[in-house]
Amino acid sequence: HMTCIVSDDDHGRFYIEDLSSNRVSHTNPPISSEISSGRCLVMVSDDAERTMCTNLGISTEFWTSDLDAEIIKASHYLFLEGYLVASPKGMEVCKKAIEVAKESDTKVSISLSDPNIVNAFKDEIKTLLDMKCDLIFCNEDEALAYAETDDISNAFQIFKEISPNFLITQGSSGCIGFDGKNEFNIPGIKVNAIDSNGAGDMFAGAVLYCITSGSSLEKGAIFGCYAASKVVGNVGPRLIKDEYHKIKHNFF
């Protein structure tokens, strides 16, 4: 289930229709507003890295009333995007969602989203992490920014004090993680990378699929690296539907 808000414009209607066509349930219909739907211009360089120029649009109006508490209560995991802390309303939404999750034993996961978000809104992110998130997703740049260090080993130790479970992705090098007891290092998968846009989302989605199906966090990380390696070989953040079935079939 995806909770978000979009305007009743071409981009917003397309987004909601795309969610529906991919069998992702959602609560809020497009809103009639003078504020446009959020948009993001993604520029991809020859090394497959991407730079984003984002207009949050009506997303800055996302409010606690847009949450569906019953959906959160019925979920195994609540997944929050760190981008939400960029607006005061988004921050309140995150806190309310975590409170609802904690009341119903729904586990909380959060993505730090972007090193610029971490640098600009570290206090806000810390507030959310202090609410005892069960699982943190971040890449190496985000981890270093949050820990205020240039040594990933130091950052790793700091994250062990923050959350019982976390995963730090390292691009083509794979990822490192901690599951509350064990540290692990998952090697990357060699691939001809074209576009890294969507790799982090694919990784997080694959991990959450695994652990909510009963697998360990380490196995989830292995699957996450495998799935992410498939999306970076294509232009754009998503694959066609059939490719997702192939990824699951080939891995499991």
How does the language model describe each region?
Residues 99-103, 123, 148, 152-252:
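Conserved phosphate-binding/catalytic region of the ribokinase-like
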Residues 26, 108-109, 166:
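Hydrophobic beta-strand scaffold residues
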Residues 1-39, 56, 250-252:
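Substrate-binding N-lobe of the ribokinase-like
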Residues 69-73, 129-130, 160:
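A short, aliphatic-rich alpha-helical micro-motif
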Residues 23, 57-64, 115-120, 148-149:
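Short gly/ser/thr-rich secondary-structure transition/capping motifs
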Residues 27-31, 42-88:
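Conserved phosphate-binding/catalytic loop of the ribokinase/pfkB sugar-kinase fold
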Residues 77-157, 173-175:
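Conserved beta-alpha-beta core of the PfkB/ribokinase-like small-molecule kinase fold
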Residues 39-43, 51, 174-178:
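Short beta-strand scaffold segments in enzyme catalytic cores
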